[in-house]
From Swiss-Prot:
Organism: Brucella abortus (strain 2308)
UniProt keyword list: Periplasm, Signal, Transport
CDD domains: PBP2_UgpB
Free-text function comment from the UniProt entry: Part of the ABC transporter complex UgpBAEC involved in sn-glycerol-3-phosphate (G3P) import. Binds G3P.
KW Signal (keyword) present: yes
Signal peptide location: 1-25
InterPro entries: Bact_solute-bd_prot1, SBP
GO cellular component term of the entry, any: periplasmic space
Name of the protein in its database record: sn-glycerol-3-phosphate-binding periplasmic protein UgpB
Complex and partners: The complex is composed of two ATP-binding proteins (UgpC), two transmembrane proteins (UgpA and UgpE) and a solute-binding protein (UgpB).
Length: 433
């Protein structure tokens, strides 16, 4: 919860509300988002709870498609001068929004308009830093931050003769387990992954402490040259390409589609966002959680935040900004953060919520649920593991996905795919400067 600033205007308003009898119409605040399944249910639940907690403002959640589609819808709406009050933007879109000076109002400023003061010391450091300017100004509100983890099917492990209580820790162990699962018939597919860009390149770089690009992956300057064709990347993606030849690895799609390959029982292991937990639980599968795999001699270092944050456009009314500030304050309440964390798998963005969850013995009762937090907070970030910030990261991800798909389709090997991705990605980054 934010610190309330008591000002003359606030006190005057409070007195007016106390003595006045006029009925005020609710101010509706559209919240455009890209959440599906269990996470969409959580968006609706939190919106309803906020709406019932007061009578001045009404949050209206609107699903606008997947993450990239939601970002594009928000940009188009702003250009047509009809922006939503709140836009959920995925991690890759942060650079796009940060570059749009004048188009957005920093979350810290929105809070001040509502009479609140943002205190970054109340938040998990890695998360608040990711969505802030170098001077510490918070630009967006970290609603659903996540960390990639390994989910595995305990029943499939048991059938394949693997220890159901010991998930593989390194990538070679994952690949060997996947082969054994496929060969034994325990599952038709051994391993799959959502988000090959976010998990297998951006977080791969951070977790294994290797550069994604120059200039600290874009955090130290916008003139970035990609470095994702170095030997460790080539080794990793060639191993995945080899597993794809006989279906030991199965590709589900560019975003979160592969999650269904796991929840259906088709694939026995899945690397996916911690925020995918809700759908995994709903599937009823006998699952376990392991940390994100790494390569010996390189990792583990620290993961970088995924998920999304809430951005606010310029040009809204003062009343809208006050309502948004109230909603952000509501989302920051410890009980709300604990609920969001425990039900969805997303990280508790406040330290108070994290401490409250630990005190309740939740992590002891739910093994693996603290893993994504420990991955992010375990070590001080290096220049390779602070994050990735490109003004056109969604476009660069599309380029990488095209090359990965050609590789997985048997049209090129990993080195060719990564060399092509670097060449095309660098050209796109240069053109966006």
């Amino acid at each position: 919860m934010f610190t309330r600033l008591i000002t003359t205007s606030v006190l005057t308003g409070a007195i007016a509300l106390t003595i006045g009898s006029q009925a005020f119409a609710q101010t509706e605040l559209a919240w455009w988002h890209g959440m599906t399944g269990a996470n969409n249910e959580m968006v609706n639940e939190l919106s309803k709870e906020f709406n019932e907690s007061q009578s001045e403002y009404k949050i209206v959640p609107v699903y606008k498609g997947n993450y990239p589609e939601t970002l594009n819808a928000g940009i188009a709406a702003f250009r047509s001068k009809q922006p939503p009050a709140i836009l959920q933007v995925f991690d890759a879109g942060s650079g796009v929004m940060m570059a749009a000076e004048g188009a957005i109002v920093p979350a810290a400023e929105v809070l001040e308009k509502g009479g609140y003061k943002f205190d970054k010391s109340q938040y998990l450091p890695g998360i608040v830093a990711y969505y802030s300017k170098p001077d510490g100004t918070m630009l967006s509100f970290p609603y659903n931050s996540s960390s990639p983890i390994l989910y595995y099917n305990k029943d499939a492990f048991k059938k394949a003769g693997l220890d159901e209580n010991k998930p593989p820790k390194t990538w070679p162990e994952v690949f060997e387990a996947a082969k054994k699962i496929k060969a034994s018939g325990a599952s038709p597919c051994g391993f799959t992954s959502t988000w090959l860009t976010w998990i297998q390149t951006e977080n791969f770089a951070a977790w294994n402490n290797v550069p994604y690009g120059t200039n600290e992956n874009g955090l130290a300057g916008t003139d970035v040259k990609l470095e994702i064709n170095s030997p460790l990347y080539v080794e990793h993606f060639q191993a995945i390409a080899d597993l794809a030849k006989d279906g030991t690895f199965r590709y589900g799609g560019r975003t979160s589609e592969a999650k269904q390959l796991f929840t259906s029982g088709e694939c026995a292991m899945l690397t996916e966002s911690s925020g995918g937990l809700g759908d995994v639980v709903k599937s009823g599968i006998n699952y376990g959680i392991g940390q994100l795999p790494y390569y010996e001699g390189h990792g583990p270092q620290n993961t970088i935040p995924g998920g999304a944050s809430l951005w606010v456009f310029a040009g809204l009314s003062d009343d809208q900004y006050k309502g948004i500030a109230e909603f952000f304050n509501f989302l920051s309440q410890t009980k709300i953060q604990v609920k969001l964390h425990e039900k969805s798998g997303y990280l508790p963005v406040t330290l108070a919520a994290y401490e409250e969850t630990k005190k309740s013995d939740f992590y002891e009762k739910n093994p693996g649920r603290e893993t994504p937090i420990l991955q992010m907070m375990g070590k001080e970030p290096t220049e390779n593991s602070k994050g990735v910030r490109l003004v056109n990261l969604p476009q660069v991800r599309d380029i990488l996905n095209e090359e990965f798909e050609a590789m997985l389709g048997g049209k090129q090997d990993a080195k060719t795919a990564l060399d092509n991705a670097v060449k095309r990605g660098n050209a796109a980054i240069a053109a966006a400067q």
